Amino acid sequence: MNVRLIVFCVASIAAAGDLSGLYPAAKLAAEKPRFDKRLNELLGIFENATNAILLPEERARLQGVQLVFPLLGAGGDPMDYHSAGQIITLPVESLLFFEDLCTAYAWLWQNHYRMEVIEDYVTMLRYRGPDAFPGERYPPPLVALRIPPTAWDDRQVNDLSLRFRNSAFAFILGHELAHIYYRHPVQRPTTEASRRYEEEADAFALELMRRSATIPMGAMLFFEVSTYYLPNLAQGRSIEKEAGHPLNAHRLQAIASQLEQNASDYARLSPTKTTEIALVKFIAAGFQKFARDLNDPEFQKAIVAHALKLDAADLAKR
């Protein structure tokens, strides 16, 4: 593999293809009411005083927060979630994309298939053009990974998928609520400020999940996908500053530390508490691995090299 080509691809990560065509507009429009209902229900759970998830001062400052659901994110980015003022923007494409990844992950896991194909798919979206796929179109996760349309009929797949999805949506919503609560500016003045804002938002979201005894399984999958898709420190400090939700090793290590320190709290309501504590610690170890990967320039180059060698047919290999 040409080293110059690899370095060029790493440097130009922010210029990924337009993924706004992942799903037909009619599909997104049909799914919008479902996501609107689910995310607003989740916001209501956070806001309900009897649940004691948001503290009184937090509820007061977050009063009037509204959720909006455009069909597409900026530039067709399927990982786009953001907030400004008292409004949190949750594009339907982004929500459906991640929900489909949760279904794919659960089905592959339940059938003891190769999990790495999810990372392969995400890296192909980031580093390859639509001509790398059949019909010269970027395919949605369930199509690209050949997940059967009956996957949800398996109760264990359904339950695991929903557990990933619901906990991820709770983390994403909590993260965006934090940006509003702390009044983080949309425009990041410095790289250091951007890092601080993201770490504060992560900590706030995880604290809400700790208070509600929700194990952040979906957050692990979200950041696993992000490690392979979103701009990070390996692509340079300027890109990290400009990214809406930049990744760096310190941010992921902070998440791991918070999970390790509060493992028993996240699992306190589980009837199998010992098993669930072990799960939280497993998730924390996963974040430590993601941090090591982000700190390894050779790993970042290897991601690009691997993506450039992949064929769409490889995504169906079990």
Predicted features along the sequence, with ranges:
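Sec-dependent signal peptide recognition
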Residues: 2-8
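Long alpha-helical scaffolds
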Residues: 3, 79, 128-130, 219-220
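Hydrophobic h-region of N-terminal signal peptides that target proteins for export
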Residues: 9-16
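C-terminal capping/extension segments of zinc metalloprotease domains
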Residues: 16-87, 91-97, 144-146, 154-161, ...
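Mixed-charge, low-complexity intrinsically disordered segments
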Residues: 96-162
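Short alpha-helix carrying the canonical HExxH Zn2+-binding catalytic motif
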Residues: 164-178
